[in-house]
A protein has these predicted regions:
Chain A
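Membrane-interface, cytosolic juxtamembrane amphipathic helix immediately N-terminal to a transmembrane helix
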Residues: 2-10, 130-173
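Hydrophobic packing residues in well-ordered alpha-helices of helical domains and bundles
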Residues: 44-47, 84, 124, 136, ...
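Juxtamembrane/interface alpha-helical elements of multi-pass membrane proteins
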Residues: 15-92
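Bilayer-spanning, highly hydrophobic alpha-helical transmembrane segments
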Residues: 19-29, 157-184
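Acidic, low-complexity proline/glycine-rich segments
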Residues: 12-20, 111, 117
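Glycine- and small-hydrophobic-enriched helix-loop-helix hairpins
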Residues: 57, 62-134
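Short alpha-helix boundary/capping motifs
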Residues: 36, 75, 82-86, 97, ...
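A generic short alpha-helical patch detector that favors 3-5-residue windows
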Residues: 42, 46, 115-119, 142
């Protein structure tokens, strides 16, 4: 009798452990997904700030583009720093690529570390064609356009964050619970 | 090792240039790039076009023609990807790159209030390679020494363009500043030299620091109008010798007179092929009348190097110790 009781209790324990693990995994997946929604507007904001700093460097600092990108990168934090310093690296010796190629290469290689989407990538891609190739007034115009576009993307991203962040979190837990119930 | 100026060219033009025979490459003076037209090089006073195989030709139809893309790349590289930092340079029409080389630009100008405000659609580039020839002034310097005052004479150096005036006064500045007088009886130390470098040619300054060796006691006023620069130098830097390139306007002459009264020695250059030429130019004839300069040197480039003839303040020919014209040769320093 004692043995049977013990076996039953052991089986129950295993089942509970399994259920907890399934729920935890699902909750984690939901949490990761929801975090992407939180990171995107944050990174867009930081990109906008970086562009605004670039505006100042160009307008008042007369700083050459590679130096400006390096300096702004240091203040921006990852993953923006990676993209900016990568762009500066390609511009400088010994690569001597054009500003356009350098920025495009950097965006290409660094984008996977960001939570940003294609819309933001396009904005930077567009900017790469004009960055460094005209006078200050013109540069400011192009940067301002990019900033405006990013701001509208940021708004969309914030909306999505409000809508989906919590949803994915609870959805994860619920999915886990659903699977557990199914298997019982 | 390839020289630093080669890195400003796009890959294909760079490989064309570095494939040139060493004798031509070493003597390169100008590389002219015009969008959609033949790539031209000037070396040793002669010109030719480059073919896309790297050969040299005089037939423009066979020549390699740089595309718009290559020109844009060149512009991006010479401006350090930052055209917006070069607004002042664009207004003047040239950019000085590392090593003191100057790149002249031609394009469409944007006017503001009747003055050139900006240069856009740049399609013509003239890369003028600066050469530093140490010792070029070795033969001229002993002729212009003023033993009485332990200084140098007021000297005007005359020559047509592209004969090496700038290279010569750069070396003069270096030697006067370091006190290598090239004369056994000249035993005074180096003097304070002030260079007014209106077009960043003499010292090739980059961010205010000379690219060339202009001597230990030399100050450079970079990108400054000559007349104003001379006054600024006299007032602020107390030079013993002033060096200016290409004087010619009447305000330059006024400033020179001022320098004379301030007790500063002046070495200047001007365009012209002989001393009599000067009298036909209104501003310069005033210089002759008040016999401001104590020595006139007329340069001529020869196959062996540089030759010069001298006239004194009364416009009499000065006979040089060994023969009418002496070759000045120097050791070229690779920038």
């Amino acid at each position: 009798m004692g043995l049977l009781e013990k076996r039953r209790a052991g089986k129950l324990m295993l089942k509970i452990l399994g259920a907890v693990m399934v729920i935890a995994a699902a909750a984690l997946a939901g949490w990761i997904r929801s975090r992407e929604y939180a990171r995107r507007p944050n990174q867009i904001r930081r990109t906008i700030l970086a562009l605004r700093r670039l505006e100042t460097e160009i307008m008042y600092g007369f700083t050459p583009l590679p130096d400006a990108l390096l300096r702004i990168g240091e203040q921006s934090g990852e993953p923006i720093q990676f993209i900016l310093s990568e762009a500066a690296k390609w511009m400088n010796s010994p690569h001597h690529r054009t500003a356009q190629e350098s920025l495009q290469k950097a965006v290409q290689s660094g984008w996977k570390y960001t939570a940003m989407k294609n819309a933001e990538k396009d904005v930077l891609h567009q900017l790469s064609f004009t960055l460094g190739t005209s006078d200050r007034k013109d540069q400011l115009g192009h940067i301002a356009t990019a900033v405006r576009q990013l701001e509208s993307e940021e708004e969309i991203a914030r909306e999505e964050q409000n809508r989906y962040e919590k949803m994915y979190k609870s959805l994860g837990v619920l999915c886990g619970a659903f699977i557990v119930i199914l298997f019982y | 090792m390839s020289p630093s100026w080669l890195t400003v060219f796009p890959d294909n033009i760079r490989s064309l240039l570095s494939a040139l025979p060493p004798s031509v490459f070493g003597g390169l003076e100008e590389i002219r790039i015009r969008e959609g037209r033949p790539l031209e090089i000037n070396a040793g006073g002669r010109f030719c076009y480059l073919t896309s195989e790297g050969g040299m030709t005089l037939d423009a139809a066979k020549a390699f023609m740089p595309s718009k893309q290559e020109c844009n790349r060149l512009l991006d590289l010479i401006t350090n990807h930052s055209l917006y930092t070069m607004e002042e340079e664009l207004r003047k029409g040239f950019i000085t790159i590392e090593g003191g080389h100057r790149i002249g630009l031609a394009g469409r100008t944007v006017l503001g209030g009747g003055k050139v405000e900006h240069l856009r659609d740049i399609s013509g580039y003239n890369v003028r390679l600066a050469r530093e020839i140490k010792g070029l002034a070795n033969t001229l310097l002993p002729q212009i020494l003023d033993f009485k005052h332990k200084s140098v004479l007021h000297t005007l150096i005359l020559s047509p363009p592209q004969q090496g005036k700038t290279t010569l006064i750069r070396d003069l500045a270096r030697q006067i500043s370091s006190g290598t007088w090239r004369h056994p009886e000249a035993r005074w130390p180096g003097m304070k030299v002030g260079i007014i470098d209106e077009r960043s040619e003499i010292a090739g300054s980059k961010r205010g620091v000379p690219s060339f060796d202009v001597g230990p006691r030399t100050d450079v006023m970079d990108g400054c109008p000559k007349a104003e620069g001379m006054m600024m130098m006299i007032r602020s830097m107390s030079p013993d010798v002033l060096i200016v390139d290409e004087i010619g306007r009447s305000e330059d002459v006024d400033a020179l007179a001022e320098a004379l009264h301030a007790g500063v020695r002046v070495i200047a250059t001007a365009h012209g092929s002989n001393v009599d030429d000067l009298s036909s130019r209104p501003a310069m004839s005033r210089l002759l009348e008040c016999s401001f300069f104590q020595m006139y040197a007329v340069l001529k480039r020869t196959d062996q190097g540089m030759a010069f003839r001298l006239w004194d303040d009364k416009r009499r020919r000065v006979q040089l110790p060994d023969g009418p014209a002496r070759e000045a040769k120097g050791r070229e320093v690779n920038a």
